[in-house]
Structure formats: C-alpha cells, structure tokens
Amino acid sequence: MAPRKSASVSSRKTAAKPAKKDFAGGTIAEFSKEDDLKAYREMLLIRRFEEKAGQLYGMGFIGGFCHLYIGQEAVVVGMQLALKEGDQVITGYRDHGHMLACGMSARGVMAELTGRRGGLSKGKGGSMHMFSKEKHFYGGHGIVGAQVSLGTGLAFANRYRGNDNVSLAYFGDGAANQGQVYESFNMAALWKLPVIYIVENNRYAMGTSVSRASAQTDFSQRGASFGIPGYQVDGMDVRAVKAAADEAVEHCRSGKGPIILEMLTYRYRGHSMSDPAKYRSKDEVQKMRSEHDPIEQVKARLTDKGWATEDELKQIDKEVRDIVADSADFAQSDPEPDVSELYTDILL
C-alpha cells in the first residue's frame, strides 16, 4: 500500500510493457523475473553502500555533510530503467544513490566521500559534489534547489541541438519552495523543454514536515499555473516509478514539454548524519520499514513467484556486500590528492 493514495499517471498504458492498476489506484509496470532481479540488485547496492557510508562517517573517515538515501532507492532505480543513452540526470545533495544508479563505480563514489585521489571528483568535491560527463550525471549540488535551473538548462541544450534526450531534475519537498524552481517551470513550459521534474517528497525538509512548510502540499500540482502536467507516484514501489517514468519520458520525447512527478517516498535516516530525527517517532519509521520497504517488496515478489530462492537472494546480497567492502577498503587506502592539485580544476 502506498504511503498515501497515488494517482495514475494517465489512463494510457506504458509504451514498453502493459500496465495494470494496483490496489492504491496507481499504474504499475509489469516486471519480468529479470526486471525484478535487476531492480533488487541495484536497490540493494544503494542500501548497502549507504549503510557502509554511515559507518565510515561514524569512524571519522568521511568529513563534512553526509546525506543518506536509505529508504528512497526505488525512486532513482525505477526512473533509470526508463532512460536511454544520452539522457541526463541532475540532483541535490542526497546524491550517492543517484550516482550508483547511473552506473558510476562504488569505488569512485566512496573514495570521493573520503576525499581520496581516486574519487570521482578527484577527492575535491566530497559527498555533495560529484560529476560524470561519461555517465551524463551533472551533480550533486549543495545549494538547495540550484540543480533545478541547471537541469532546465540541460533540457534547453537538448532542444537547441535537436536531439531527443531528456533531462531529469531531482529535488526535494523542501527545495520545491525555492523561487528558482518556478522560474525554471516558466521557462520550461514556455519553450516546451524536455525535462522531468522529480519531487522526492520524503515528508521532511530537514526537520520540518511538509504540512508546516507548504501551503500546497500536493507538489505534483505546483506547475499547474504554467500548464505543466503533474502526477503523484508511489515512490516506494519500483514498478509504479517505472510506469510513471515510461510515460513521462514519452511525454518529453514527443515534444510536449516538461512534466512533474511527485514521488511519495520516505527516508529512514535523519536529514544528514548529524540529525537525530527527533521530530518523528520510532513507530512511524518502523511502520514505513515494515509495510512499504522498496527492497522487501521486490524480495517478496521474487520468492512468492518462485523466481528466486532465499539462498539465491543471499548470494546476491553477498556479492553486493563484497562490492561495497571493496569500495570502503579502497576509500581508506587510496592516497589523498597531492597539495599541488589544490588549484587545479578550479574555475576562476
């Protein structure tokens, strides 16, 4: 069951696979055995990676801020399943999961967290500022909401070049109240730019609940005055995300302009590693874990349908843990950047 009732993206079926209605009323994609196994492995990699990052932070290997993506894995994994080569992704500071889903190496991401030479930004960007032109990932941004206008710019570049690539701009429910978000909506609607605005509504902007910070709590309707269609999606179900992603991508590629997807999701950890999250109860968190966990949903489907045994799933978990352990070892042993690198890669 979804965290709160989600709406169907449209009555039209997804282009890739037939869709059906789940009990919450939202559209879900039909997943094959291979689809579920792929989603399970990729979400599990993000989960185990973030758990290890939290451990390294506690041990003092990671400095500064560290925002974990635990609980929200279905959002980025489901969206990536609908993309093609050349589509771009940009997000805010809770970005480790997005990078892994885009295919960036666990070693490179973890080494960047510890500020090492082998990090994706050569140890100079840290948790919030990683980029990969090769993977079409444009950050990782520490300024709240700044990525929305940049993601709109990526879509403008696609339109200008005449390709059919789509830009995905992720931001949270807190960033949704930033003025530059609405400037971006206006420009994207005016020029019919191929951008999907993905609001990851995890219910809390740092420690402030949505109801205390937003007069309009249905973020999918934030673009209505610009004529931008928007839909709520069960962001805890990777199939629902995939179905919404398929239709949103088709909407953009066909020249219809921007679209907004509000992902109803939940983060299990605090806003950052320094946040004890006392603004919510343990029962609330446990209820979400026990009833809506995105990984457990896929695991249950795999076993219920006979697509995987418990031993096979344990083997996948072991393989993922080995990848994460290797990344952690590398991130602790790789040298820090030489002092001569201090002023390189700096835009003046």
Swiss-Prot record:
Protein name per the record: Pyruvate dehydrogenase E1 component subunit alpha
InterPro entries: DH_E1 (IPR001017), PDH_E1_Alpha_Subunit (IPR050642), Pyrv_DH_E1_asu_subgrp-y (IPR017597), THDP-binding (IPR029061)
Keyword Amino-acid biosynthesis: no
Assembly, per entry: Heterodimer of an alpha and a beta chain.
Swiss-Prot/TrEMBL catalytic activity: N(6)-[(R)-lipoyl]-L-lysyl-[protein] + pyruvate + H(+) = N(6)-[(R)-S(8)-acetyldihydrolipoyl]-L-lysyl-[protein] + CO2
Protein source organism: Rhizobium meliloti (strain 1021) (Ensifer meliloti)
Reported cofactor(s): thiamine diphosphate
Function: The pyruvate dehydrogenase complex catalyzes the overall conversion of pyruvate to acetyl-CoA and CO(2). It contains multiple copies of three enzymatic components: pyruvate dehydrogenase (E1), dihydrolipoamide acetyltransferase (E2) and lipoamide dehydrogenase (E3).
